[in-house]
Amino acid sequence: MESCLSFSSPPPTKKNIQEPVRPNAKFHKSVWGNHFLKYASNPEQIDYDADEQHEQLKEELRKKLVVNVTNERVEEQLKLIDAIQRLGVAYHFQREIDAVLNNLLLFRSNKDSDDIYMVSLRFRLLRQQGHNVSCSVFEKFKNIDGRFKDSLRDDVRGLLSLYEATHMRVHKEDILEEALEFTIYELEQVVKLSSNDTLLASEVIHALNMPIRKGLTRIEARHFISVYQHDKSHDETLLKFSKIDFNMLQKLHQRELADLTIWWEKLNVAEKMPYARDRFVECYFWGLGVYFEPQYSRARKMFVKVINLTSLIDDTYDSYGTFDELDLFTDAVKRWNVNETDKLPEYMRPLFMELLNVYNAMEEELKEEGVSYRVEYAKQSMIQIVTAYNDEAIWYHNGYVPTFDEYLKVALISCGYMLLSTISFVGMGVTTVTKPAFDWVTNNPLILIASCTINRLADDKVGHELEQERGHVASGVECYMKHNNATKQEVVIEFNKRISNAWKDINQECLHPLPVPLHLVVRPLYLACFMNVFYKDEDWYTHSNTQMKECINSLLVESVPY
């Protein structure tokens, strides 16, 4: 589904522009430096014992998944699939999971008809897989007066399962809105009445803060391993497999980071661009949110290079460049020619040159596979975002506060997710993504608009005050307050409402029939999840020396103990 919005930039004018004093953003230095270089210093060592055990355990799990679904096995199968997905190893069993869930659509089980836990789990798993199952299955859990039954309060596991299911809701599903309100209240009561050190209370607290639908797979897998191993009913084969798999992937990610660190150090950002955020490892972490699987290694490396350069360009526009300098850089990117380099100020030249180099390298590599056309889509997306950055610079230098609608037309581009969604496709395998998929993602489908909306409004909510302190174009908060005569609290309420609706759009767009395969549709979803995690209460990317550092350490430094 295509958005009816037009994203052509408004025609700003340059009037009475005075040369500004360069702002001083005062971003903290890189947290990680060249920490990950050490993973390149040792030759790659294969743990043959772990590798062999990994394959044996995988085959055992596969056999458990392919058994015939019967009344007696439905609950067991659904719980196994849920655990496999939450432990981050579903990519090994996608065909088997698809087969089980497809069969489940045809299979009617009476066993779970009055079990809120199983009904909710079945609903969530099917919707996660793109099946448009009806939410009417929850009607049976209501009283005659239209309220959820009091008996549900005694089933904490059932409440938790229903709560997770509500996050798959789309527009006009009132029963799921009611269920969300009901479960949040009841689960908060559980927390109040329980000791926070109990496993169940901890699960509830975690779920209320980060529902499954909106979490990042690798972060949630790391968390769920510790939860699952204390579950008395856990599958020992699955637990062992997930730990080995987590550590094997971690080693791959460490080697990728080592290779990319060599590239990054050559840019010498700390000296050549000291005004910018040096967030190389954090950008890699962003890439892991989009895809962590080994088959996307090349795509991930390309993605990480582009997002790092985009972050530097963003800071050049927001935190350092003068109006005339930014105009020159914008023109250079639009012309996309190495001859433009000499027209740029000295400090901009390394950045512009590396942008061309990275894109040229991608094109050369993809040319061998006959898919170099992909880079042209990536190039146009980069030109689009740089143009949006410049439009915002013009607003700032003119002291212009756009209407909220004007702001969104530019800000949904400058947030970066249109570019990143396109880039996320570029390095994928030849058969994984085709030209029609690039036409789809670059034509502003609703799921992408929704992801951009979540990005922009979440960022504006947590970061606008700091941006205004250091000199920045008016954020969505200021634009909405000025032109709607609203208070900051009213803006937050409005933004939260829009973000909630955007999640419903995302859920709707992930249901069959799909315009492109689900493994492509979900990339904007995963980008939205990143914002939900790292911009929930503050800007973890800019202030990456606290919670972001802890997350990176748990996923990319510390292995899971066996």
UniProtKB/Swiss-Prot annotation:
Expression sites (tissue/organ): Predominantly expressed in root.
Binding site for Mg(2+) 3: 467
Gene3D superfamilies tied to this protein: Farnesyl Diphosphate Synthase, Terpene synthase, N-terminal domain
Binding site for Mg(2+) 1: 314, 318
Co-factor note (free text): Binds 3 Mg(2+) ions per subunit.
Alphabetical keyword list: Lyase, Magnesium, Metal-binding
Source organism, top-level taxon: Eukaryota
E.C. designation(s): 4.2.3.139
SUPFAM superfamilies named in the record: Terpenoid cyclases/Protein prenyltransferases, Terpenoid synthases
Family to which this protein belongs: Belongs to the terpene synthase family.
Protein name: Valerena-4,7(11)-diene synthase
Gene this protein is translated from: TPS2
